[in-house]
């Protein structure tokens, strides 16, 4: 028996109380100057799972997760334009306590958001070119998800999974030889981390979950595996060939268990710098916070990502926001440009509440932790200019 870490089952909270909390925070946003509309949503899941197999394994497990979010909108009626900004709070493997002060400071974020939105609405459009980027974990988690998480699913690398979001450039012949990123890059898969969306005691093949290396000192060293993929390719953790690392998941009894993503995370440097120190080391750059839209090719290689906030960095200082920013690179180019990773104080566990895979399609939730990080010489596009091409 295994139960995830939470304090208050959100389904024990009345609908009236849930609506009241969402309304309270929404009304604070609407009361601020420059906020013309607010969208609020809360998704909550209670998952009870019983598993038994012919080898004698029997497990009973329960997981709880929530995803609250608020989006503030500014409307410039004269120009016919609008700007929006969403809260940065990630989905989490927590209960109702997450909305009332445990794990996230909603009061602080709701108070700060209108000012950031007003600045964003009046910000100049970015001049495209090469910039040094300091990327906050509220943005970087998504880049990890798309360019590392999906790329290191072995079934995808072998071509078993192609119809839903493509295969992978990280093919089996590159294992142990591909310089995925710079020497400061260390990435793990981990289905045991507290409050992770993919965290559980046993996977859907009865395998105990664990932490394992995917990238070590920049070198590609491991895949995410289920039993079928591990056995067929003589791969596994701790030097033991043919052993799953606990990455099987089915979203319902009516679906076969697929190899699904663990909580794939970039590790901080134990004595790494703060966000302010990372910014202080940049002469001309952009500090990026929050995720928005993205695009990546069918091999998980060529991509572009946007964000919520883009703060100019000039001579080590933030000097106001710009807008219409997307950073573009190939996966290995981008991760090899990572010069510095922040320390544990910059670390945040972000994630995706609904990640799709397979045909028939299945949905899984997965977290991605990371520190803030500094990337040198990344190509930045102006999204408005690109749209006009």
Q: Where is each model-derived feature located?
A:
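N-terminal small-residue-enriched
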Residues: 1-389
């Amino acid at each position: 028996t295994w139960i995830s870490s939470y304090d208050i089952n959100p389904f024990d909270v009345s609908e009236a109380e849930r609506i009241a909390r969402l309304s309270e925070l929404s009304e604070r946003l609407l009361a601020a100057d420059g906020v013309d509309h607010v969208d609020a949503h809360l998704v909550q899941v209670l998952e009870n799972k019983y598993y038994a197999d012919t080898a004698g394994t029997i497990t009973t497990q329960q997981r709880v997760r929530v995803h609250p979010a608020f989006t503030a909108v500014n409307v410039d009626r004269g120009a016919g334009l609008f700007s929006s900004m969403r809260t940065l709070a990630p989905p989490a493997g927590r209960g109702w306590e997450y909305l009332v002060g445990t794990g996230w400071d909603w009061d602080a974020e709701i108070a700060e958001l209108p000012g950031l939105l007003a600045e964003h609405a009046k910000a100049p459009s970015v001049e495209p070119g090469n910039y040094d980027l300091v990327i906050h974990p509220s943005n970087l988690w998504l880049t990890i998800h798309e360019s590392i998480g999906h790329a290191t699913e072995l079934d995808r690398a072998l071509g078993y999974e192609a119809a839903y979001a493509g295969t992978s450039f990280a093919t089996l012949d590159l294992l142990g030889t591909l310089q995925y990123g710079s020497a400061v890059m260390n990435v793990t898969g981990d289905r045991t981390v507290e409050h992770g969306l993919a965290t559980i005691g046993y996977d859907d093949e009865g395998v105990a979950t664990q932490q394992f290396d995917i990238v070590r000192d920049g070198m590609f060293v491991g895949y995410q595996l289920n039993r079928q993929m591990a056995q067929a390719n003589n791969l596994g953790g701790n030097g033991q060939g043919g052993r799953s690392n606990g990455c099987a998941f089915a979203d319902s009894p009516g679906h076969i268990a697929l190899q699904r993503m663990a909580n794939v995370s970039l590790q901080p440097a134990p004595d790494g710098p703060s966000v302010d120190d990372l910014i202080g080391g940049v002469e001309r750059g952009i500090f990026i916070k929050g995720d928005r839209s993205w695009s990546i090719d069918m091999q998980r290689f060529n991509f572009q990502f946007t964000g919520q906030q883009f703060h100019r960095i000039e001579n080590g200082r933030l000097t106001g926001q710009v807008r219409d920013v997307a950073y573009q690179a190939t996966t290995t180019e981008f991760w090899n440009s990572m010069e510095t990773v922040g320390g544990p104080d910059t670390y945040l566990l972000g994630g995706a509440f609904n990640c799709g895979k397979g045909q028939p399609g299945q949905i899984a939730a997965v977290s991605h932790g990371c520190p803030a990080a500094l990337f040198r010489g990344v190509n930045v596009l102006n999204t408005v200019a690109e749209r006009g091409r």
